[in-house]
Curated annotation (Swiss-Prot):
PROSITE patterns in alphabetical order: PITH
Start and end residues of each PITH domain: 20-192
SUPFAM superfamilies: Galactose-binding domain-like (SSF49785)
Keyword Transcription regulation in annotation: yes
Location in or out of the cell: Cytoplasm
Name of this protein: PITH domain-containing protein 1
Modified residues (Phosphotyrosine): Y189
Protein's job: Promotes megakaryocyte differentiation by up-regulating RUNX1 expression. Regulates RUNX1 expression by activating the proximal promoter of the RUNX1 gene and by enhancing the translation activity of an internal ribosome entry site (IRES) element in the RUNX1 gene.
Species for this entry: Homo sapiens (Human)
Induction: Up-regulated in K562 and HEL cells undergoing megakaryocyte differentiation induced by phorbol myristate acetate (PMA).
A cellular component term, taken from the record's GO annotations: cytoplasm
Keywords, ordered alphabetically: Activator, Cytoplasm, Phosphoprotein, Transcription, Transcription regulation
Length: 211
């Protein structure tokens, strides 16, 4: 079955096709633990703060009491600051079983406070989405473009024809790198970390926060 495609590299696969057993599958989508939720923004959400609720444990993805719906039109823009540097490997987008499900996702890296006007620029990667009602379809990023990310913007630009868009879950898979205390600016954070200077974690819900 076709799972959609991406422009500029990457693709889509079932989470069930991943090598780890089902009980371990949710551990891979632990980057939500590394989001600075207090600073996360969702533009054009109909209910203030609802966009934060879709970044949750993979095991809770089917909880439909938490969702975000767009307001004025079908577009949503998530501005996602991380607490360190991230190597983003894959994304899951779960929606409703109707035309409100997102049909296109555009990714931008390291543009804090991004606005809808900023989405006129070329995205780092664009995906055509299939309907995913169970949180099983992963869209693989082009890792060479997303290996040094401190801020991610997800632009839901289209749905399948409804007036508004609904999203129930966004899963992020990848690795998180701790920033050193004396790092002056994240922008200068080297792409190839020296293991002696940094600790790299495959993020899982069991990982402790570094304060």
């Amino acid at each position: 079955m076709s799972h959609g495609h991406s422009h500029g590299g990457g693709g889509c696969r079932c989470a069930a096709e991943r090598e780890e057993p089902p009980e371990q599958r949710g551990l891979a989508y632990g980057l939500y633990l590394r989001i600075d939720l207090e600073r996360l923004q969702c533009l054009n959400e109909s209910r203030e703060g609802s966009g934060r609720g879709v970044f949750k444990p993979w095991e809770e993805r089917t909880d439909r009491s938490k969702f975000v719906e767009s307001d004025a039109d079908e577009e949503l823009l998530f501005n996602i600051p991380f607490t360190g540097n991230v190597k983003l490997k894959g994304i899951i987008i779960m929606g409703e079983d109707d035309d409100s499900h997102p049909s296109e996702m555009r990714l931008y890296k390291n543009i804090p406070q991004m606005s809808f006007d900023d989405t006129e620029r070329e995205p780092d990667q664009t995906f055509s989405l299939n309907r995913d009602l169970t949180g099983e379809l992963e869209y693989a990023t082009k890792i060479s473009r997303f290996s040094n990310v401190y801020h991610l913007s997800i632009h839901i630009s289209k749905n399948f024809g409804a007036d508004t868009t609904k999203v129930f879950y966004i899963g992020l898979r990848g690795e998180w790198t701790e920033l050193r205390r004396h790092e002056v600016t994240i922008c200068n954070y080297e792409a190839s970390a020296n293991p002696a200077d940094h600790r790299v974690h495959q993020v899982t819900p069991q990982t402790h926060f570094i304060s």
